[in-house]
Amino acid sequence: MALQDLGENLQPWCPLGLSLEWVKTVWDLDFTEIEPLDPSIVGEILETGRDAFTKLYGSLFPFATDESGSLESIWTFFTENDISSNTLVALFCHFVQEAHKKSASAQYREYGLHAAGLYFLLLEIPGIVVNQVFHPVMFDKCIQILKRSWPQESNLTQKRKKDHSKSSKDNYRKSRKRGKPPRKEDYQVDELSREEEEEEEEIYFSGRDLCQIRDAIFNLLKNFLRLLPKFSLKEKPQSIQTCIEVFVALTSFEPIPHKFLISQARNLNEVKHISELAYYGLYLLCSPVHGEENKVIGSIFHQMLNVILMLEVGEGSRCAPLAITSQVINCRNQAVQFVSSLVDELQASVYPVLGTLLQHICAKVVDKAEYRTYAAQSLVQLLTKLPSEEYATFIAWLYKYSRSSKIPHRVFTLDVALALLTLPERELDDTVSLEHQKFLKHKFFVQEIIFDRCLDKAPTVRSKALSSFAHCLELSSSNTSESILEIFINSNLVPGIQNLSNTVLNPSPVLTSRNGYSAQSRTHNNDEQTLPGERCFMTMLRKRIKDEKINVRKSALQVLMSILKHCDILSMEQDLLILQDHCRDPAISVRKQALQSLTELVMAQPTCVPVQKAWLMGVIPVVMDCESTVQEKALECLDQLLLQNIKHHKKFHSADRSQVLAWSLLALLTIENQDLRRYLNKAFHIWSKKDKFSSTFINSVISHTDTERSAPAWMLLSKITCSSPKLDYTKIIESWERLSREQSPNSNTLGYMLCVIGHIAKHLPKGTRDKITGVIKAKLNGFQWSPELISSSVDALQKLCRASAKTVLEEQGLLKQVCGDVLATCEQHLSNILLKEDGTGNMDEGLVVKCIFTLGDIAQLCPAIVEKRVFLLIQSILASSAHSDHLPSSQGTTDALDSQPPFQPRSSAMPSVIRAHAIITLGKLCLQHEDLAKKSIPALVRELEVSEDVAVRNNVIIVICDLCIRYTVMVDNYIPNISVCLKDSDPFIRKQTLVLLTNLLQEEYVKWKGSLFFRFVSTLVDSHPDIASLGEFCLAHLLLKRNPTMFFQHFIECIFHFNSYEKHGQYNKFSQSERGKQLFLLKGKTNKEKRMRIYKFLLEHFTDEQRFNVTSKICLNILACFTDGILPMDMEASELLSDTFDILNSKEIKLLAMRAQTSKDLLEEDDVALANVVMQEAQMKIISQVQKRNFIENIIPIIISLKTVLEKNKIPALRELMNYLREVMQDYRDEINDFFAVDKQLASELEYDMKKYNEQLAQEQALTEHANATKGPEDSDRVPSAQVAPDLEAVPALAAAPMAAAAAAAPMAAAAAAAGQDNADVPPTQSRPSAPRSNFTPTLPPISENGPLKIMSSTRPMSLSTIAILNSVKKAVASKNRTRSLGALPFNVETGSPENPSSHESSLSLEKESDRTVNHVTKRAISTPENSISDVTFAAGVSYIGTPATFFTKEKHEAQEQGSDILCLSLLDKRPPQSPQWNVKSPARSHGSTRSSRRSLRKAPLKTAN
């Protein structure tokens, strides 16, 4: 029966007109190329449509499932009826191939799926002929139709599909490595895909079509899975690979709504989703039937990798990242779940393959934050399936991976470590080796992976590591959080950490290196060089907080906040201050992070007063930030902690931490941090515009005025009423009446109350206003209130009078009426004290202060009623100076100031506190009366210089600066006197002057004239670090913004000014007083570091254009002046040139475009940053070429010429020139070679000079190291008796005549001693060989008569020749205790007695320098003989006679060497003999060429050293 049905259903598939040749061709071509089938035959087959496939399938199905019985054989039936299986397969292939086309209709796609199902059914039928039916290409096509028959992205509109394709390609191109253009093949593939898309756009699929195709795919897949267990693919690896690719692609075909388990998919009849069938197909492929397990599983995992990493999957896929949607995430979760199930079932056999998968996840994860996070979660989830031994092995590999040279690898390791920390810690297992047991502990992830990455050289990695630390400490799992804290505690990483039970754990406060070993052995190529102490967590964190990269600082602040949450704040107040200071960080995002961190910290520790104060000092001033987003963040933090927690006092609960915190903060603002209240005015003004203060809120504040929180409540009301005066006035007036009657009211509360009354005055009834006015007037008349309340009282009086008056004139009349009596009382009281004989003897100091203060405030309100008598009274107070008689007059004042007498001389002496208040009052009077100001300003300036009282000087500065706004021209002449206060002995005065001058300069009341700029920038090197920091802020962030060229315009003159060089015709020519010069003196070697700090600060804030121009200006205005002989070459010039070359050699003067490294670790999602890098590289190339051209054409010629001049004059600045020349020869080697191409001899000389100079530096460094290594313990307690400068001039590479060079050392020493005596008492700072200082001239004390001179270890290394000559001097002095006589020298040296230290300094300098050149160790120049000209002795009364070099026998030579420690000097009346000329001819001269005068000067004949 089955065979009969089969015969009927096979009829359409056995058309009579079918060409056997066509069938043969299909098989011969291995199904790769199929010729079109005759349409009539196709029509004959499809006459019944889909039934042709389904009926044949129904007929064949019983034979595949053995339902037809064993008596019937389909293959026998085929043979008997002459039915060819090859023909059937060829016809099936035709329909399969048609369905593969993108232009295929829904019907043909369905036909193709059915045809593939018939082919699989033939393979399923048992029998020997099955091997003839199978063909690998046909098999693969039938499998691939499962994927290709489904219309691509059919659920999208055509436009959306086109846009997505374009976007996907764009994203792929963006993800390509920069600088690597797409290949030609990529463009060709793009063209093909574009054509295919256009073809596909013409096809429309209805919902019904899609459902039919989906059902056909489902049925075909189910049938194929029924075939897989029966049909082995063991010998068909390509078919297995095709199956895996198709199955993996189908896993994301449709979502699986329920939790997927492989065991459920084994019953195919119960499976409803294609994705489930695909996973079951992958599971079936893992059967031993299809080959070696691990190979197949490895291929499956390889394909599943893209699903897990959320990349494109499929044939021809470029593995571009997919948009992260819920469907993509679900596919990832299902893939991880499948791999986990497979590992659970196969156990140990699959562990190696799983390890490979985990490694590939690490290596191929997309370098974007979200992809990394999901990949790390997947990896950790799979890692839990491994037993401890394999787990530890993988962690060991991960640890090595964390030290990869690629930044994305190191970043992803941190994601993995963070994910692993969320898991419970594994217990130790006996199967794990001892060396691998550490990998099971959380401590390893924290200390060995995350901590080490905090020291990474890449800022992206450092930032990620710090963020990981912060996340560790904020983990929601209490167990994990405790374990992290436990790691810190046990490692002594952080002092005073609190555990979660709020108990304070205080390990050793000493921050030691963790694990007790040195960090130097742990450094890696990807890590920064760390010192032994930097392995401590807090040391590292403090360094990261100062990191140059913004994201690193942000992350470090997060970590610091997390640490402080769990710490004893009292032991970490310095770190709390760091968090506070970063609210003013230059970077906007860092400021926001600091605000957020401080807010979170104060909410975590609401009862900690230091944290509360830090929050106030950090957050409140930021409401004035110039960046609106930062300002909004600060307002948000204030609103969150202050306003939102203010409730009615009936709802106040001490257990409510937020309410308690709000009132605690307000109380601190009221009492301790009153200076911050001015910033609150800005905040409340902004809030009032937003209608922030409702009547409910205001009434809630008022309800606290009668509680213990009254002072902060009144303070808050004073801010609110300024903008929202809708208050319950009755309650306020009642409180006023009660408090005003008290004998000693609280000053703070009463002051705020007066402020509130002033704001609501216009809303009060007239009777109430008059009553309050009377009370205030009476209190002022009786001086019953403290000075703190006087200003508030006067302000309240003014507002009350304004509220009572209808016009301005009426207001003035009321003020005169009210204030006139108070003013008269003050005048009478002062007259009684100052004009009566015994007035000062019985005066009440506090009462006088109140009187003076009241008078000043009243005078400002009513200047018309103030009589001249009041002026005289105030002036008489100031005239009574207790120190005006004995203090010398300042030398730095103008003639008018010198002749200015004290205000009005008087014999009485007033206390300083009264004089200080009198100055403030005088300033208020001067603001209203110009004539008084003209008389008072010179006297005030005089007082500024002679007064010893800090309060008096401070008030004088404030008054003069205020008067500068009112009378700018009048005060302008005295700005130099004010700027002198920048060097006042008191730090407070210096800081006050700095702030006031900054304000005046910002508003342009004061101009940068004369010495003001140079005095202002000298604050950068103030001895007080806070003042230096404030100076930096004022200059860089306030003043430079108003005048961007300010630094550039003054830079050249800075070099002259700070070296006190006044020989230039243009620079440093402004007038200065001697006192000012001495106060701001920065010349000399001792101040070299300070000067360089100023120069570098200015250069750091130059633009690249300014750096380029200032380099040229330095060469033209400084260096060229010396090469052209405009300026004299002397010791003053040496200091100036030394500074100049150090500036040119500094990294700060190099163009940013040239010294900035292209960022290799851009932020992941920042495509704009990538474009910026490309622009930066192009800009750098252009600027570099311009800079190099300018350098070669304009700078190098000047440098070379100046080198010759310095060598000729033996100037110590030659050392700095050589340093600079060495650097530029490295930076511009090719350009310099081109420059010297025309003068190869000069080039060889310069190269030789540099070689010898480098050798000398290396020799000095070696000697220093040797001296440090051999120095005995007793040497450390000795005080060095001599500081020996390095031997610069003795090196033949720097001078053609080395002995003449040594001879020039003594006048330099003498000149230095005369010009820079301020350096004698200060030891020179230690210098490094790579960047030596210009400490050329040694300073030696006189030789002791009791013993030989002892040379101790100096701060600078000594050459071998120096050591030799000093040893000779020591021996000579020890053996001959008698007076030495000096012969005539070929240059002028001041001689003196042995008791004169300067005499010894000069002579010893001479001896030291001269012997350096004689010593045989010294390297010789090109034209210098190897042996010395003659032996030199050191003895009295022996004259020198020059003789030609003589060759001795061995005995005579040994005899000569016995006296080698004797030095002989010529007599004063003798001229040194000329040395013999060397018979050496230059090849260049032999051809008649003449050398330049400059070169002939360099190669002068040798002179004798004496």
Curated annotation (Swiss-Prot):
Annotated coiled-coil segments of the chain: 1213-1270
Pfam families in the record: Cnd1 (PF12717)
UniProt region (Disordered), positions on chain: 154-194, 884-908, 1317-1353, 1385-1412, 1473-1506
Ranges of biased composition (kind: Basic residues): 1492-1506
HEAT repeat residue intervals: 442-476, 532-567, 574-605, 968-1004
Cell location: Nucleus
Record-listed Phosphoserine modification sites: 562, 1359, 1368, 1381, 1393
Protein keywords: Cell cycle, Cell division, Coiled coil, DNA condensation, Mitosis, Nucleus, Phosphoprotein, Repeat
Lineage: superkingdom: Eukaryota
One GO BP: positive regulation of chromosome segregation
GO cellular component: condensed chromosome; condensed nuclear chromosome; condensin complex; germinal vesicle; kinetochore
Described purpose of this protein according to its UniProt entry: Regulatory subunit of the condensin-2 complex, a complex which establishes mitotic chromosome architecture and is involved in physical rigidity of the chromatid axis. May promote the resolution of double-strand DNA catenanes (intertwines) between sister chromatids. Condensin-mediated compaction likely increases tension in catenated sister chromatids, providing directionality for type II topoisomerase-mediated strand exchanges toward chromatid decatenation. Specifically required for decatenation of centromeric ultrafine DNA bridges during anaphase.
Record's subunit section: Component of the condensin-2 complex, which contains the SMC2 and SMC4 heterodimer, and 3 non SMC subunits that probably regulate the complex: NCAPH2, NCAPD3 and NCAPG2.
PANTHER family, A to Z: CONDENSIN, CONDENSIN-2 COMPLEX SUBUNIT D3
Protein name in the entry: Condensin-2 complex subunit D3
Biological source species: Mus musculus (Mouse)
